[in-house]
Design a protein with these regions (language model features):
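Short gly/ser/thr-rich secondary-structure transition/capping motifs
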Residues: 39-45, 60-62, 138-144, 203-209
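Short, charged, surface-exposed secondary-structure boundary motifs
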Residues: 55-56, 88-92, 112-114, 193-194, ...
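Short beta->alpha connector loops at strand-helix junctions that form conserved
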Residues: 23-24, 47-48, 81-83, 103-108, ...
């Protein structure tokens, strides 16, 4: 279903002559119901096994589960996030299936960027600060520190390792909550870009010139 598994992308594919099969309630958790997909021209299929059996191309978000790997056919094309580096069993299963697998996280654009990984990284970066702030609360057995401080109290120190998409988005939330933010990255050029973005709201350090224990 293109880069986004939405009714709009289904409509585009159908208009180009493709047949699109959607698993029953497959879009429910993302806020899309069966009728939206049907109105876009998709066929709603009750069982995932039937989709794996009939489709030439499988489009997913999460890596194939063990039961799904067993359903993948030879030469079937599978688009999804795979993260195979830490998944030996999944890797071996896909190799055995002789299918063609394209991992979203490895697709690059003309500038060498990872456009399909960036949205997930942005979410991860923003959520990390929220989760950290939550864990600092006393009722979570934290130190009882507010990320942005309070009258008479210092704000929390937030150390961000890496200034990529994850780090940048973590900094957006951390600076927005008025924490003290340090960003460490190996690239001097990237750190300069971040300073342009955040100004004096952050302190930057090159990773080969800093003692993390002192931050």
């Amino acid at each position: 279903m293109y880069k986004r598994q939405t009714p709009d992308s289904v409509k585009t594919l159908v208009s180009e002559g493709h047949e699109v099969l959607v698993e029953n309630n497959g879009g429910f958790e993302a806020g899309f119901d069966n009728d939206q997909y049907k109105n876009a021209g998709a066929k709603i299929i009750e069982k995932a096994a039937d989709i794996f059996n009939d489709a030439e191309i499988i489009v997913k978000v999460k890596e194939p589960q063990k039961v799904e790997v067993e359903m993948i056919k030879e030469n079937q094309i599978v688009y999804t996030y795979l993260h195979l580096a830490a998944a030996k069993e999944l890797t071996e299963g896909l190799v055995k299936s002789k299918s063609i697998n394209i991992a979203y996280e490895t697709i690059t654009d003309d500038n060498g960027r990872l456009p399909l990984l960036a949205p997930m990284s942005a979410v991860a970066g923003r959520m990390s600060v929220q989760a950290g702030a939550h864990c600092l609360e006393k009722n979570q057995k934290g130190r009882g520190i507010l990320l942005g401080g309070a009258p008479g109290g210092e704000p929390a120190n937030v150390l961000i390792l890496g200034g990529g998409v994850v780090g940048e988005n973590a900094a957006i939330i951390a600076t927005g909550m008025r924490a003290k933010v340090h960003i460490v990255d190996k690239s001097e050029e990237r750190l300069k870009q971040l300073v342009k973005m955040f100004g004096d709201k952050i302190i930057t350090e090159q990773s080969d010139k800093v003692d993390l224990n002192k931050l």
